[in-house]
Regions:
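Acidic/His metal-coordination segments adjacent to aromatic residues that form catalytic metal sites
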Residues: 1-13, 80-107, 157-158, 171-191
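Hydrophobic packing residues in well-ordered alpha-helices of helical domains and bundles
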Residues: 12, 42, 104, 133, ...
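Amphipathic, well-ordered alpha-helical segments in soluble domains
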Residues: 18-26, 52, 56, 110-117, ...
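Helix-loop segments that flank and shape redox-cofactor active sites
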Residues: 22-44, 114-129
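Conserved alpha-helical segments that form or flank metal/cofactor-binding pockets of metalloenzymes
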Residues: 46-81, 147-155
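Internal, conserved structured core segments that host functional sites
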Residues: 91-146
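A contiguous pocket-lining binding segment that forms or flanks enzyme active sites
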Residues: 128-190
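Extended, helix-rich structural scaffolds rather than catalytic motifs
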Residues: 162-254
């Protein structure tokens, strides 16, 4: 399959934007995580998520070209130079996590969802997307294993367990927004780009959350914003930080 329809393009941008911003959020914990091993782990996970985003942006910039020959500037334009209203990220990946318990809870909630999301495009008719999914599925599995390892240690401890569960409760309304139907998703499914809508995996993710934290997402009210077109208040400062180096010399070729 080559040549992207408008709906498939929107579908892929939402996917890429989530991976990009989650990678950036993880990267902001490098050097300030509670212990050195987590500096290194979050650095590695951030690189993976940013790599996933780059692969998805390249598919969009290259119009689905199986050769994957996308212009680097076109990829950078998608990643850094769109206006806020043109982004399709979920607010869940936009909000700041200034507390380690919050960051760890989001790490688990996100990767438990993304593992399911990437599986939906593993057999995509869009060849470069299927190839990207092969790597991403392996990496998301490792990400989830990392988060689970920490949670196995921290949840049984009263103080840390209480803080993590409180963070999960705080994040759940926004995390449900990851499953909101994306503009163009119906077209992507009809064209075989994805095997099913992402919200068909919500029940599986809900059961994972219930089993991991003893908290039922089905009892939580969703955030009032949906559709991935309304930016959170934390988005503007996050985007400014992401553009900081580009802003030093907009004409430079990196």
């Amino acid at each position: 399959m080559s040549g992207l329809g408008g709906g498939t393009r929107e579908f892929l941008l939402a996917f890429a934007d989530d991976e990009h911003l989650m990678g950036q959020q993880h990267a902001e914990w490098i050097g300030v995580a509670p212990f050195l091993e987590e500096d290194l782990a979050f650095c590695s996970i951030a690189q993976d998520e940013l790599g996933h985003a780059a692969s998805l942006y390249a598919i969009v910039a290259g119009d689905g070209d199986p050769a994957g020959d996308a212009d680097d500037r076109a990829i950078d334009d998608l990643a850094f130079h769109r206006e806020p209203g043109d982004w399709r990220s979920a607010q869940f990946v936009e909000v700041a996590s200034t507390d380690w318990a919050h960051a760890l809870a989001r790490h688990w909630l996100y990767d438990a969802a993304e593992e399911l999301r990437w599986a939906l495009v593993a057999d995509s008719t869009l060849t470069p997307l299927a190839h990207a999914a092969q790597r991403a599925c392996r990496e998301e599995s490792f990400h989830l294993r990392h988060a689970d390892g920490l949670l196995n240690l921290l949840l049984p401890v009263p103080d840390s367990g209480d803080r993590i569960r409180a963070a999960v409760v705080d994040l759940l309304p926004l995390s449900l927004g990851l499953f909101d139907p994306v503009a163009g998703e119906a077209e992507a499914v009809a064209d075989g780009v994805a095997t099913a809508p992402f919200d068909t995996r919500l029940a599986t993710w809900t059961e994972r959350v219930r089993g991991r934290f003893g908290i039922d997402p089905a009892t939580v009210a969703r955030s009032g914003h949906s559709g991935r077109t309304v930016r959170s208040p934390d988005f503007a400062p996050l985007l400014k930080r992401m553009r900081e180096v580009f802003a030093l010399d907009p004409s430079a070729i990196w």
